[in-house]
């Protein structure tokens, strides 16, 4: 009997998109033969899910579910915006979000094992949806936000924001809209991750040195570039989306509002998409997928 290693399970999971436990079970039944495991999966009820798993799922939707002082943002990916608008896809995304919020679990592998209201696991429901719709579908990430007050904002299907705040409800809602539009990195300049500041400084130094200016001038140029960067990415330094004459910091002060935390999800962040297909290629791909 071949020993089933973690690397074997990971390889099968990467190739099929199935949960770790499903992959381990398939490998055990195939005595460690990955290709045989995939063949067996394709012969089973997971056939279409296994076949579609190699397709890049960079479209999709952000779903937000709130319950009192807790809210969850979930990104579920598919391959096309057409499927992202499908009622079955939307129902699945909402069911997953509710299960995550109820359990408090956001780890991808454990989320796959959560039970939905109809008794299916998330993974079972995902596979069934892949078989029904014909696209690769993945629950990519989730984040739970808790706070005294929460403001929720969605821009279509692709962007979702949850803001935890104290103070004015109107300002909280405005900040959620602002975060969706301006995509700040942190609440304040001091909270911007040090590695991002260091990277910006390194780039600024390289440009300044190329200018051939004296060292003291180079130092000022670098300082100015870093300051400009912080003004662009720190929430409190940005110009307010609802009133471009005011900085966010001024609006927060005037309304006695404090931003504790914000989370912004945008569909497909960090996922490399394939080049757009022509209409003829899309038709050919659809015909191939239907076989």
Curated annotation (Swiss-Prot):
A Pfam family assignment: EF_TS
Recorded superkingdom: Bacteria
Cellular-component GO terms for this entry: cytoplasm
Primary location group: cytoplasm
Region (Involved in Mg(2+) ion dislocation from EF-Tu): 80-83
Keyword Cytoplasm: yes
Entry keyword annotation includes Ribosomal protein: no
Its job: Associates with the EF-Tu.GDP complex and induces the exchange of GDP to GTP. It remains bound to the aminoacyl-tRNA.EF-Tu.GTP complex up to the GTP hydrolysis stage on the ribosome.
Entry protein name: Elongation factor Ts
Taxonomy of the source species: Bacteria, Pseudomonadati, Pseudomonadota, Gammaproteobacteria, Moraxellales
Gene from which the chain derives: tsf
């Amino acid at each position: 009997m071949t020993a089933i290693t973690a690397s074997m399970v990971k390889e099968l999971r990467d190739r099929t998109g199935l949960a770790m436990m499903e992959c381990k079970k398939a490998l055990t039944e195939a005595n460690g033969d990955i290709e045989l495991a995939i063949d067996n999966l394709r012969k089973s009820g997971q056939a279409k899910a296994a076949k579609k798993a190699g397709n890049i799922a960079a479209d999709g939707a952000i779903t937000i579910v709130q319950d009192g002082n807790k809210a969850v943002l979930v990104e579920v990916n598919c391959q096309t915006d057409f499927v992202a608008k499908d009622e079955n896809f939307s129902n699945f995304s909402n069911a997953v979000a509710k299960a995550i919020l109820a359990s408090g679990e956001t780890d991808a592998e454990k989320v796959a094992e959560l039970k939905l209201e109809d008794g299916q696991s998330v993974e079972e429901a995902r596979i069934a949806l892949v078989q029904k719709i014909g696209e690769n579908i993945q629950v990519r990430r989730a984040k739970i936000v808790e706070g005294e007050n929460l403001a929720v904002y969605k821009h279509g299907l692709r962007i979702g924001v949850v803001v935890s705040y104290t103070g004015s409800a109107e300002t909280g809602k405005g900040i959620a809209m602002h975060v969706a539009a301006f995509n700040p990195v942190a609440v304040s300049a001091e909270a911007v991750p040090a590695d991002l500041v260091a990277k910006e400084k390194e780039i600024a130094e390289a440009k300044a040195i190329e200018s051939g200016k004296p060292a003291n001038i180079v130092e000022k140029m670098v300082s100015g570039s870093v300051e400009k960067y912080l003004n662009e990415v720190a929430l409190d330094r940005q110009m307010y989306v609802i009133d471009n004459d005011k900085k966010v910091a001024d609006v927060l002060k005037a309304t006695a509002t404090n931003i504790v935390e914000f989370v912004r999800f945008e569909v497909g962040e960090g996922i490399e998409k394939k080049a757009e297909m022509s209409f003829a290629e899309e038709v050919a791909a659809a015909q191939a997928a239907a076989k």
